[in-house]
Amino acid sequence: MGFLKKLKKRDDRYARIGMMKAAKKDEKAAERVYFENRNYAERVYMKTQRSRFLTQVAFLCAVREAFHFGQKRLFALLPKAVIYDECCVQNKMFTVKEMRDQLELETGYRVNLDDINGDFAFQETKRVVDEVTVFYLFALASLYDMGKKRLARVYEGATDVSGLFAHDSNQICVKVKEIEDAGLRMRFCGKNAMDLAKEIAKL
C-alpha cells in the first residue's frame, strides 16, 4: 500500500492534512518528512484525544489575549500558553471548562463549549467559520513551533495555509512566508483581533 493510502487511514487528522498535501506532489518526500516528525506528531495530536483539547485551549487563549491586548499579535504567548503556563499546574492540565469559566470571569463573555472542538474550523456552515479558522491556525502553528518545525517545512510546497483546510475565504490571508518571516503575522481585512474575539464569544 502506498504511503498516501496509508496516510488516509490514520487518525491524526491535523498532521495528516498537511502530509496529504505534500504527498500529492512528492510522495517520497512527504513520507520522509512525516516519519521525521512522527514521534512528535503522535505525542501531541493522538495521545488521549489531546489534539482536540489543545485546540480548545489554544482557542480560548487566543480569545482571551485578544480581549487583553486588542490588536497586539497573539502568537507570542500561544506556545507557552497552550503547553505550559495556562494549562499546567504541577503537571495537571486544566480542563476546557475551567478555561472557559476563567475567560468568562475576565471578559464577561461566555463561550459555548459545544462549538469549540477540533472540527469547528472545518464546518463551513458555522456563522463565524472564518474567524475560528484564524484561531485554529494559531493553535496549529504554535504546536508545530513547539516541535521546532516550521510550517513551511512541514507543509512542503504549500503557499497558503488556509488552503490546507479547504477554506477559500478571502478574509483569511495567512501565508507561509508571513509565518516564516514575521511569526504568524495576519491581516484581518479591517477587523481587529478584539472584534473577532467578541464575535466568537457571542456564540
Question: Where are the regions that the model predicts?
Answer:
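Non-catalytic, largely sequence-independent nucleic-acid-binding elements associated
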Residues: R153-G163, M194-L203
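Protein-protein interaction interfaces in oligomeric scaffolds
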Residues: A66, K72-R73
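A structural feature that tracks compact, well-ordered secondary-structure segments
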Residues: R64, L77-L78, A141-S142, K149-G157
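Intrinsic disorder/low-complexity detector
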Residues: L4-V63, E86, Q90-L140, Q171-L203
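Amphipathic alpha-helical segments that form the core helices of the histone-fold
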Residues: L77-C87, V154-G163
